[in-house]
């Protein structure tokens, strides 16, 4: 696994320009690196009280855009989460292709203004788990325990040895073509809100691309 394509993010740190720069730099390295393999983020932590002091909508917008960039990278992305995860830690977990968590991990929305933070993690939670599954987390701030996160398909695996699990996924990812992975991911994104007729063209284009690549390999 390429050690250059790893980021450790502490969700207890308030969102800052440095947060944006760190994730942007990871995306830069991922786009420049020609070696096969995944991009990995290790996330944990919950912002402390008062974490929004000095925070602006402009900075939030920059953060959401770089998370979206991470979400659309041309290679497999893996998140490894532990402990309590909220704020920027939850944002990256929900944007990753594959999610490994340790036992006891809990997902939650950061508290703010007498409620929960209304960032794009709410959007991803709703898209991935459905409104009924995440209402209590969004409206009441109820933590999503690991068993429920599994049942809602918000995480893929609970592991006592995440390093071993990650190594297995990295080996599988090394055999993948990054551009093709990005195409499959985009199909998944679009298929959740597209009719069969509208989706057919994109799938046929992807199939044609795959056949052409296979014919020249």
Swiss-Prot record:
> Which keywords does UniProt give here?
Antibiotic biosynthesis, Lyase
Q: Name one GO biological process term.
A: vancomycin biosynthetic process
Q: Could you tell me the EC number(s) of this protein? A: 4.2.1.17
Q: In which pathway does it act?
A: Antibiotic biosynthesis; vancomycin biosynthesis
Spell out the reaction equation it catalyses: a (3S)-3-hydroxyacyl-CoA = a (2E)-enoyl-CoA + H2O; a 4-saturated-(3S)-3-hydroxyacyl-CoA = a (3E)-enoyl-CoA + H2O
UniProt keyword annotation of rRNA-binding present: no
Superkingdom per UniProt: Bacteria
Q: Which SUPFAM superfamilies match?
A: ClpP/crotonase (SSF52096)
Q: What InterPro entries would the database entry show?
A: ClpP/crotonase-like_dom_sf (IPR029045), Enoyl-CoA_hydratase-like (IPR053545)
Q: According to the UniProt record, what class of enzyme is this?
A: lyase
GO MF term set? enoyl-CoA hydratase activity
Keyword Repeat attributed: no
The UniProt similarity line reads: Belongs to the enoyl-CoA hydratase/isomerase family.
Q: What does this protein do?
A: Involved in the biosynthesis of the nonproteinogenic amino acid monomer (S)-3,5-dihydroxyphenylglycine (Dpg) responsible of the production of vancomycin and teicoplanin antibiotics. Catalyzes the syn-addition of a water molecule across the double bond of a trans-2-enoyl-CoA thioester, resulting in the formation of a beta-hydroxyacyl-CoA thioester. Physiologically, DpgB could act as a dehydratase, facilitating the aromatization of the DPA-S-DgpA or DPA-S-CoA intermediate.
What is the name of this protein?
Enoyl-CoA-hydratase
What is the source species?
Answer: Amycolatopsis orientalis (Nocardia orientalis)
